[in-house]
Amino acid sequence: MERNLRKKRLGRVVSDKMDKTIVVAVETKVRHPLYGKTVNRTTKFKAHDENNEARFGDRVFIMETRPLSKDKRWRLVEIVEKAK
C-alpha cells in the first residue's frame, strides 16, 4: 500500500501514560439519519509515539500503519499544537 493513500486523522492526546504509546481521541460530526441533528462522535485510537514526545492535551496528526501490537494500528506523524 502506498503511504499517501493511508488514512490520516487529527485528534487530541487523552493519555500518554504508556511507553511509546499515546491514546488519541478523534472527534467526527455525523448527521443523525432520522432527525438530522449533527452529533459529535468520539473514537479513541492507540498510536505509536517512538520518542515519547506527545503530551496530554496536544493536537496531533496520526497515520494508519501496519499492526504494531494487539490494539495499535496508527503512528504519530506530527504535533500540530502543544497543550498549554
UniProtKB/Swiss-Prot annotation:
InterPro entries associated with the record: NA-bd_OB-fold, Ribosomal_uS17, Ribosomal_uS17_bact/chlr, Ribosomal_uS17_CS
This protein's UniProt keywords: Ribonucleoprotein, Ribosomal protein, RNA-binding, rRNA-binding
Entry's Gene Ontology molecular function annotations: rRNA binding; structural constituent of ribosome
PROSITE patterns linked: RIBOSOMAL_S17 (PS00056)
GO biological process: translation
CC per GO annotation: cytosolic small ribosomal subunit
Ribosomal protein among keywords: yes
Self-association state and partner proteins as the record states: Part of the 30S ribosomal subunit.
Family, per entry: Belongs to the universal ribosomal protein uS17 family.
Biological role stated in the UniProt entry: One of the primary rRNA binding proteins, it binds specifically to the 5'-end of 16S ribosomal RNA.
Protein name: Small ribosomal subunit protein uS17
Species annotation: Clostridium perfringens (strain SM101 / Type A)
Gene that this polypeptide is encoded by: rpsQ
